[in-house]
């Protein structure tokens, strides 16, 4: 019995030693979705009609947000936070690429979407596909969106997933950041990814 106990104890010590030697996993504030089987590709036209794909942004940490220009709160808050994070990161802010995908291509014309995106930074890439293309992109990212009738005839708003998807500089999906997490938490996560976490 004593030999068995010693072996178990020795095995436990070996396991603890190996765990101590292995590299520390990054302590993200957002939800770590590294290796997810979704959000692996994005291919939509920008506001000039040029096809854009995620791979062209390799070398940067990419933050993808699905929203719309007439969104009263979540969208402008999220985009303003991303802009603030970029500023807070100083020179490293240039290593962050924000992408806005409209879920309301009906009202978000290229001109309106382009002006809206630019109000949160000249480097924000705004993507606008057909409704079918938008649905396909949303499905790939497991993003929900739906038109909700407004209070007046013909008016509507959009319900949509309120969070951002973050890719590392190698183009791998890494994080889902919920709306309302705050600038400090997002800055911490993006800083770790820029550093190669």
Give the label of every model feature segment.
Residues 19-20:
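C-terminal motif of bacterial Sec signal peptides marking the signal peptidase cleavage site
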Residues 55-74:
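Short active-site neighborhood of thiol/selenol oxidoreductases, capturing the structured segment around
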């Amino acid at each position: 019995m004593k030999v068995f106990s010693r072996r178990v104890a020795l095995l436990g010590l070996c396991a603890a030693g190996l765990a101590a030697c292995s590299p520390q996993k990054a302590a993200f504030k957002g939800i770590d979705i590294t290796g997810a089987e979704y959000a692996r590709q994005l291919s939509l036209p920008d506001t000039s009609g040029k096809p854009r794909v995620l791979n062209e942004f390799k070398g940067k940490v990419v933050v993808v947000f699905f929203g719309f220009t007439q969104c009263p709160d979540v969208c402008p808050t999220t985009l303003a936070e991303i802009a603030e994070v970029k500023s807070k990161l100083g020179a490293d802010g240039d290593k962050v690429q924000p992408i806005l995908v409209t879920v309301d291509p009906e009202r978000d014309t290229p001109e309106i979407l382009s002006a809206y995106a630019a109000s949160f930074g000249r480097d924000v890439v705004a993507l606008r596909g057909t409704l079918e293309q938008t649905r396909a992109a949303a499905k790939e990212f497991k993003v929900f969106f739906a038109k909700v009738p407004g209070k007046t005839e013909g008016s509507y708003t959009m319900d949509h997933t309120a969070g951002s998807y973050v890719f590392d500089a190698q183009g791998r999906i890494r994080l889902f950041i919920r709306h309302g997490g705050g600038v400090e938490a997002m800055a911490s996560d993006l800083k770790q990814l820029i550093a190669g976490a």
